[in-house]
Amino acid sequence: LGALLMASGLGYDSAEGRAIAAAVAAIMTGTAYATSAEMAKLMGAFPGYAKNRDAMLRVMRNHRRAAQGAGSDYEKLAIHPVALDVANCPDSALIEAARRIWDRAIELGEKHGFRNAQVSVIAPTGTIGLVMDCDTTGIEPDFALVKFKKLAGGGYFKIINQTVPLALKTLGYKDET
């Protein structure tokens, strides 16, 4: 995510950056729940789903409303979530994808239930992604454009963020080599 925002020339804490992050999170979570519903069709819903069906579907509908950018009309929520900021998302395809996948997740979930009660977690950053050619490893911005990874056998491995040249070009900087 950090590399995507950098390559797009968007500030991590800009309205546009937050909107892209929210759209990506909505797509990932909606896809995971749609897949969970497909699994429930084949393997059955999670234990306890029948008892919690109404509450689970209400949660899913509220997730869909947030993914659609709804400011109100949430079901049985005292505090409304921060909805996807549709107006500030510079990529309308992400918005449309989020809307479609949440519609699909609800449709499938109403028919088959869900195999999983929870489908996503955002883990802390790790360094494995850096040696797999990922310029950023988590949801936060890159902590350094040049990093040194200590090797178990001794020595260091230099890792350079390869997104910087694209980000500078996107922001209008000229290559003066």
Language model features: what each stretch is:
Residues G2-T177:
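Long, C-terminal-biased catalytic regions of enzyme "large/alpha" subunits
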